[in-house]
C-alpha cells in the first residue's frame, strides 16, 4: 500500500512540474553545439524576414513611383488635348460645328492661279455659243406664243361694263372666252350690252343716227338771227341712252351675285364639272313644278271635256 501511494505522489509531482523553471542546459544529454546552431538559424530566419520586408517595401515604393510617373504623363497628355471650339472634350455639337466650318471654308485655302489666254478664249466662245442658242430658242418660243395668243384672241370677247351698284359706279374691262360662263352670261344679258364689245351688239347705223340727232338738235336750237330757241327737244329713248353709254344701268343684288358667280366659275375652271354634275337649282326646280302643274291642268280639262261630251250624248 505504501508503494502505491509513493508512485501516485511521484505522478502528481510530475504533473505539477513548472515549465518556467526548466532549463535545457541542466539536462544530462544537453549538447551546446546544437544550441548554437539553433540560435544561428533563428537569427538567420529573422534577418531574412527583415530583408524580405525591406525588399517588399522598396518594391511597393518603386511601383508607386512608376504609377505616379505614368499618371503624370497621362495628365500631361490629357492637358494638351484642346479642341478648336475651346473645350477639353469634343462633343457631338462641336464635331458638327467643325464639319460645317470645314465645308464652309474649304475653298478659302485654294490658290487661284492666273488663267492662260487659251482658257479665256475658250470660255468666251462657250458664252457666245450659249447666248446665240438662247436667242434662237427665245425667238422660236416667242413665235409659238404669238400664234397661240392670236388663236386665243379669236375665241375671246372684250367685256366692258359700267353699272351702278350700292351707290357706286363700277367699271369693268376684261377679255373672257366666248364659251365661258361669264361670256355666255354677258351675251345673254341684253340689258348690260354697251356696244363696244361685239360688232353685232351695236350696229353702226344706230350710232350714226344718235350722233346726227344730237347735231341736228344743236343746230335747231339757233334761229336765223342767231338767237337760241327755247323749245325742248324730244327726249331720246332709254335703250338708246344705254347703248350710247350715257345711262348706267342699275344692278340688283341677285344680278350682281349671278355675275360674280359666273366670274368665279371661270376663274376656278369648274364650268365643265358643273355641267357634268349639275342637279339644277331653284329656278330649274320651279320650272319643273310649273310644267307638272300645267300638265295636270291640261289633263283635267281634257277629262272634263270628255265628261261633258258623254253627258250630251246621253241626253
From Swiss-Prot:
Domain of life assignment: Eukaryota
Coiled coil feature spans: 56-115
Primary location recorded for the protein, binned into one broad class: nucleus
Pfam families with a match to the protein in the record: BCNT (PF07572)
Acidic residues bias (residue ranges): 9-30, 57-73
Bias-annotated ranges (Basic and acidic residues): 31-49
GO terms for cellular component: Swr1 complex
Residue numbers spanned by region Disordered: 1-84
GO biological process: chromatin organization
Segments forming domain BCNT-C: 233-310
Assigned keywords, A-Z: Activator, Chromatin regulator, Coiled coil, Nucleus, Transcription, Transcription regulation
UniProt-annotated location(s): Nucleus
Record function comment: Component of the SWR1 complex which mediates the ATP-dependent exchange of histone H2A for the H2A variant HZT1 leading to transcriptional regulation of selected genes by chromatin remodeling. Involved in chromosome stability.
Subunit structure: Component of the SWR1 chromatin remodeling complex.
Family as reported in the entry's similarity comment: Belongs to the SWC5 family.
Name of this protein: SWR1-complex protein 5
Native source organism of the sequence: Kluyveromyces lactis (strain ATCC 8585 / CBS 2359 / DSM 70799 / NBRC 1267 / NRRL Y-1140 / WM37) (Yeast)
Encoding gene (name): SWC5
Amino acid at each position: 500500500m505504501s508503494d502505491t501511494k509513493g508512485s501516485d505522489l511521484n505522478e502528481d509531482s510530475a504533473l505539477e512540474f513548472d515549465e518556467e523553471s526548466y532549463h535545457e542546459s541542466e539536462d544530462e544529454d544537453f549538447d551546446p553545439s546544437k544550441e548554437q546552431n539553433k540560435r544561428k538559424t533563428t537569427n538567420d530566419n529573422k534577418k531574412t524576414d527583415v530583408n524580405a520586408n525591406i525588399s517588399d517595401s522598396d518594391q511597393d515604393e518603386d511601383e508607386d513611383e512608376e504609377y505616379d510617373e505614368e499618371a503624370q504623363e497621362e495628365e500631361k497628355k490629357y492637358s494638351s488635348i484642346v479642341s478648336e471650339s475651346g473645350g477639353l472634350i469634343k462633343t457631338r455639337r462641336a464635331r458638327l460645328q467643325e464639319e460645317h466650318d470645314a465645308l464652309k471654308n474649304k475653298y478659302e485655302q485654294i490658290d487661284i492661279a492666273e488663267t492662260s489666254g487659251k482658257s479665256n478664249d475658250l470660255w468666251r466662245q462657250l458664252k457666245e455659243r450659249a447666248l446665240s442658242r438662247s436667242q434662237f430658242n427665245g425667238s422660236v418660243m416667242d413665235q409659238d406664243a404669238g400664234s397661240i395668243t392670236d388663236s386665243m384672241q379669236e375665241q375671246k370677247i372684250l367685256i366692258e361694263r359700267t353699272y351702278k351698284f350700292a351707290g357706286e359706279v363700277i367699271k369693268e374691262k376684261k377679255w373672257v372666252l366666248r364659251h365661258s360662263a361669264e361670256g355666255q352670261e354677258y351675251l345673254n344679258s341684253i340689258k348690260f350690252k354697251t356696244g363696244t364689245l361685239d360688232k353685232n351688239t351695236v350696229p353702226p347705223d344706230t350710232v350714226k343716227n344718235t350722233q346726227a340727232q344730237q347735231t341736228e338738235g344743236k343746230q335747231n336750237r339757233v334761229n336765223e338771227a342767231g338767237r337760241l330757241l327755247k323749245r325742248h327737244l324730244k327726249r331720246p329713248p332709254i335703250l338708246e341712252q344705254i347703248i350710247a353709254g350715257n345711262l348706267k344701268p342699275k344692278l340688283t343684288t341677285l344680278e350682281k351675285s349671278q355675275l360674280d358667280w359666273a366670274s368665279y366659275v371661270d376663274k376656278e375652271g369648274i364650268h365643265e364639272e358643273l355641267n357634268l354634275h349639275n342637279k339644277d337649282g331653284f329656278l330649274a326646280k320651279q320650272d319643273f313644278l310649273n310644267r307638272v302643274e300645267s300638265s295636270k291642268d291640261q289633263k283635267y280639262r281634257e277629262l272634263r271635256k270628255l265628261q261633258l261630251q258623254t253627258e250630251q250624248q246621253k241626253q
